[in-house]
Amino acid sequence: MIRVLQDGILEPVPFFLLHHQHSALECDAAFAAWQGFASPLRRQPAVSSCLAGGHAVWWRVETPDRGAALALLPPYVAHRTDAIPVRDVEIP
């Protein structure tokens, strides 16, 4: 997605990799936190290592900034999540 800045310059909207981690004991709470929370990420597939014993979840989101990226998550999940700016690259 491209956004237009005030001076008319085109700029790509940043992508963030949301990397959430929780302990095995927090797994149920991390998933329950989504109940009643409105987000476009709900009911969508996410990459997770929970069923493999790693207890991490990753989302790739397109938002203007880190705060907007973390706002897509329920507070319980957001407090345990890093929002990492990422860009696509071609691998030679």
Question: For each predicted feature, which ranges?
Answer:
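Conserved, structured core segments of small domains
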Residues: 2-92
